[in-house]
A protein has these predicted regions:
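Bacterial N-terminal signal peptides that target proteins for export
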Residues: 1-12
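Formylglycine-dependent sulfatase
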Residues: 8, 15-467, 477-498, 525-554
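Short hydrophobic beta-strand that contains or immediately precedes a catalytic carboxylate
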Residues: 470-471
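Residues forming the ATP-binding cleft of Hanks-type serine/threonine protein kinase domains
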Residues: 474
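A contiguous, mid-protein "functional segment" used to position or interact
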Residues: 487-522
Length: 554
């Protein structure tokens, strides 16, 4: 072959290699993962029933209308740090080691951004991080810990070691500052020759809810609809674990909106946290319990929804920019909250419980190139599945250490594979911390939920009464009728218990992490008559301890 021919052939081959590489890059979509803190499905128009007419989320609703909306997406532990750890590792908390708010994920174990970078993506993390260790992204600008709503401060890259490089924005609101930072990254940092993987994480609407003053008038003259269970729950609801023997623990299990819980309630928090706004004394005997609960509920919902409105308005800014830059339709956009949240149902606040209001995550995925608009799916998705989905869209192999599984085919067809999971696993470890929630675990299928309140801390101590609850989600989607002891559900109960025990092993929760806690779990698993009598005794003992603690506090 002549030299000129060899040169020409080499140029052609090089051009083909280069062209094929560019094609592969162009075929890979950008990925934008948006997560708000405590944004529950009940407060999104695409999901909401009670609050739908308030229309707090037109931008998110439009995203849902253009993609797929999942009705059965769940976190495996309804608390901020563990949920985020599941998403960045694809592992359950008992595997990645983040059981509670004190957990952290080492840089070398931050699997999702590491693999995205290896796949040729430019990676960025902006907003709430809450995993303590330095983020392993090409770019990061993250809140310290939980962060503040105003005078936003970020930890950034710089000459000093993590976490000493800090930038502050006096007078800013976090939702605005986080969005400003994301838009600045797109305008100043994005490499147009690479696909991007951006995690944009709002602090809002985490409590205590503080919105920008421009939202003060939003809903000011509106009476927010109240869930019926805010006021009363049937006698069939709950168990000795959540009510106590003869209802003796109703004041002490789960923090409240109204005065029910004397240790912590939103009614008591309002004048303490917002003294200029709420000058009334909730202990005033001239204010009835009904009046106080109604005042507290209206404040709780309005403050929360104003934060949600700030999130939605800022998302419009981001989506408008992506459209202007012709990036919107070439980007897989995922919207979620890190867990659900109580909006007054059952007179509970915060999250943490295995009940759907706090365990369910909103989950919306839009990518018009392969996902049709207006799809809804009842497939069971867990937050450990999120990173596998994103890696799948990026063309990466899913590593064996990830316990989650990609649900891309469900996004693109609306159909579950024959071998798709039929149950979600849940475990909350922070027994009686912050919001008075007992240690619990559950299995949830599409039709039933079985919850085991084992009721102890990591050392098997500070016990609350153990009990089981079973809910028929088809007949009782609000989980108000515990059918665990009803004869007609005995077969369902026994079958679910066997499935539950197997699921624990399948996900790696074998109890070896905290053996003393596991001894309690096993001790009351069968829940025979002797166990029930011991649970009554534990209920009495806990009530006495709690009443003594409250007396000492006074």
């Amino acid at each position: 072959m002549k030299r000129s021919a060899r040169i020409f052939l080499g140029l052609v081959c090089g051009w083909l290699v280069t062209f094929s590489g560019v094609a592969r890059s162009e075929d890979r979509p950008n990925i934008l993962f948006i997560m708000s803190d405590d944004h529950t499905a009940q407060a999104i128009g695409a999901y909401a029933t009670l609050l739908k007419e308030l229309d707090p989320t037109p931008t998110i609703d439009a995203l849902a209308a253009d993609g797929i909306c999942f009705d059965n997406a769940f976190c495996t532990n309804s608390i901020c740090t563990p949920s985020r750890a599941c998403i960045i590792t694809g592992q359950y908390d008992h595997v990645n080691g983040v059981f509670d708010l004190g957990g952290r994920i080492a840089r070398e174990k931050q699997t999702l951004p590491i693999l995205m970078r290896a796949q040729g993506y430019q990676t960025a993390m902006i907003g709430k991080w809450h995993l303590k260790v330095e983020p392993n992204y090409d770019f990061y600008k993250v809140l310290p810990g939980q962060g503040k709503y105003f005078d936003t401060e970020f930890r950034i890259q710089g000459v000093k070691p993590w976490p000493k490089n800090v930038v502050k924005y006096p007078g800013s609101h976090s939702s605005d500052a986080i969005m400003d930072s994301t838009l600045a990254w797109f305008k100043e940092q994005r490499n147009p020759d690479k696909p991007f993987f951006v995690c944009h994480h709002f602090k809002a609407p985490h409590d205590y809810f503080e919105s920008h003053p421009r939202y003060d008038s939003y809903l000011a003259d509106v009476d927010i609809p109240e869930p019926a269970s805010l006021w009363e729950k049937p006698d069939t609801w709950g168990s000795v674990a959540t009510r106590g023997y003869q209802d003796e623990l109703i004041p002490h299990i789960g923090t409240s909106i109204g005065r029910r819980n004397p240790r912590r309630s939103y009614a008591a928090d309002l004048p303490r946290v917002f003294p200029d706004e709420f000058k009334w004394d909730y202990r005033n005997p001239n204010l009835t319990d009904v009046v106080v609960k109604r005042l507290a509920y209206q404040a709780y919902l309005k403050k929360y929804l104003r934060c949600v409105k700030g999130v939605d308005d800022n998302l419009k800014r981001l989506f408008d920019y992506l459209k202007e830059e012709n990036l919107f339709d070439n980007t897989v956009i995922i919207y979620t909250g890190d867990q659900g949240f109580w909006l007054g149902e059952k007179d509970y606040q915060d999250k943490r419980w295995a009940y759907d209001e706090s365990a369910r995550m909103p989950l919306i995925v839009r990518y018009p190139k392969t996902i049709s608009s207006g799809i809804r799916s009842d497939a069971i998705i867990e937050n450990v599945d999120f990173p596998a989905l994103m890696l799948d869209f990026a063309g990466a192999e899913i590593p064996s250490q990830m316990q989650g599984r990609s649900f891309r085919s469900i996004c693109e067809t609306g159909i579950e594979p024959d071998d798709w999971k039929q149950a979600a696993y849940y475990r909350y470890w922070m027994h009686m911390a912050h919001h008075d929630n007992p240690g619990e675990m559950s299995i949830r299928t599409k039709n039933h939920k079985l919850i085991y309140f084992y009721g102890c801390d990591y050392q098997g101590e500070k016990q609350t009464p153990p009990a089981w609850e079973l809910y028929d989600l088809v007949k009782d989607p609000r989980e108000l009728n515990n059918v665990y002891d009803q004869p007609e559900y005995r077969e369902v109960r026994d079958r679910l218990k066997v499935q539950f025990a197997k699921l624990r092993l399948d996900v790696g929760d074998d109890g070896s992490h905290y053996p003393a806690c596991e001894r309690i779990v096993q001790e009351f698993w069968d829940y025979d008559e002797a166990d029930r009598q011991r649970a009554i005794k534990i209920s009495n003992q806990f009530r006495q301890r709690r009443e003594a603690e409250l007396a000492d506090r006074k």
